Every structure is written in C-alpha cells, then in structure tokens.
C-alpha cells in the first residue's frame, strides 16, 4: 500500500471519503526509529489466571522499561495478577477503565482446564477497547505438548485460536496479538521474545505462536546490541 494513500486516508477529509466509499483506512504503523529506543512505553496492563508461572518474570521484564506497569484486580479469576511486581499499580477493571494501554499481557501458563479460560474473558472483555493504536496483546501459555492431562492440554491449545481471533479484531488499528508457549521451568527464557513482541520491531507480526523450551541460564546480553563482542562467519 503506497505511502500517499496511507497519508491521505489518515487526514480528516481522506478518512471521511474512505468511509463513504468503503475503502480501507489503515493506521500508520509505529516503527523502530533508533536502536536504543525503549521496547515499550506508556501504560501496560498485566493479568494472570490461576497458577500463573511467568507472572513475576513478566513483571520484571516490563519493569525494566519506561512503561507504567499496572496489574488487573477485581474478578476473582485474576487474583494471581497481584504477583506481577511490587512496582505495579493495582487497577480495578470491573469499573470504568480510563486511558489507553500500550500493551495488554496475560499469563495463562497455569490454566489446568477449559473452565479456567474464563479468566481470559474477565481480563480482555473490559480492556481490549482500551488498547491504543499500534498496541500489543501478548499471551503466555504452556506448550500443550508438555501438558500431562487432556483438560490442561485442551485449555492451552485453545489459546492459539483465541490469539488469532483477537489479532483479526485489533489489526485495523495497527495493533498485534501473539502467543508464547513455554515449556515447564522455561520462564527464565522469556526475555527476548517478550521484548520483541512488545516492541515496534514486531509491527508486521501478528497471530503467531512461538515455542520456548527449557535451557540453561545464559549470560545476559545487551538487548540493544546482542551480538556485541561476537564474531559472525558469513
């Protein structure tokens, strides 16, 4: 799609004309402007279902950014959200939610049966309309192949369809939705994937699934220059 059309339909006159003619009105995508740009800014809301295993890790990763971190409160199904971080501000989502969120993150890694998927509804139903243009939706689950019981595997597998459906709904505003499946005890490997999916680097990536396996704790790298000090043979 040409830049001229994109600029035109995002003017007041162009937007009105596009709506009258039934033409698409794509949102300008936020792109990476400098290498040291923070991976996420603005307000970020985190929620979690029963038995969430990655909630503290997610709080630590997002807490390293300039973003203002909030954790969802209100519904009983989201009680685990309070474990996000002591820096996170509690936000009751059962009332009127004001402002816009740069990202909505949900830890579903502990869900054990389909009934517990209710937590997803309780978190996203009152907040999805508050997702900002170019916002990010990220869901963390457990890889169904590592689940020991059928109900747990079914609940985790359902996350894929949910994320793809959300991605289609929010795509028109330049937002993305992605899913990360982690193996048991692989929470410490989430950092790079979370940073990527929340950043402008993932502007064209939506409805995707990434699997993360367990690995030994690696030496921390510079997220701005991860290949610094290394030699590449091409």
Residue spans of the language-model regions?
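Glycine-rich nucleotide cofactor-binding loops and adjacent beta-alpha elements
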Residues: 1-226
């Amino acid at each position: 799609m040409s830049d001229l059309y994109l600029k035109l339909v995002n003017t007041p006159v162009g937007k009105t004309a596009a709506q009258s003619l039934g033409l698409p009105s794509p949102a300008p995508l936020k792109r990476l402007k400098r290498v040291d740009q923070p991976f996420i800014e603005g307000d970020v809301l985190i929620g979690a279902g029963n038995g969430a295993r990655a909630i503290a890790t997610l709080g630590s990763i997002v807490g390293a950014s300039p973003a203002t971190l909030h954790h969802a409160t209100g519904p009983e199904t989201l009680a685990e959200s309070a474990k996000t971080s002591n820096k996170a501000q509690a936000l009751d989502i059962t009332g009127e939610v004001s402002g816009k969120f740069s990202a909505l993150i949900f830890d579903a890694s502990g869900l054990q049966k389909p009934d517990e998927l209710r937590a997803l509804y309780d978190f996203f139903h009152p907040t999805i309309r508050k997702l900002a243009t170019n916002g990010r939706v990220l869901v963390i689950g457990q890889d169904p192949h590592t689940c020991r019981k059928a109900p747990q595997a079914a609940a985790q597998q359902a996350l894929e369809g949910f994320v793809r459906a959300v991605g289609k709904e929010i795509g028109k505003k330049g937002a993305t939705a992605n899913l990360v499946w982690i193996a048991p005890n692989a929470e410490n490997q989430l950092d790079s994937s979370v940073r990527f999916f929340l950043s402008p680097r993932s502007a064209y990536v939506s409805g995707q699934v990434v699997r993360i396996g367990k690995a030994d704790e690696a030496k921390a790298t510079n997220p701005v220059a991860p290949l610094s000090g290394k030699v590449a043979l091409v």
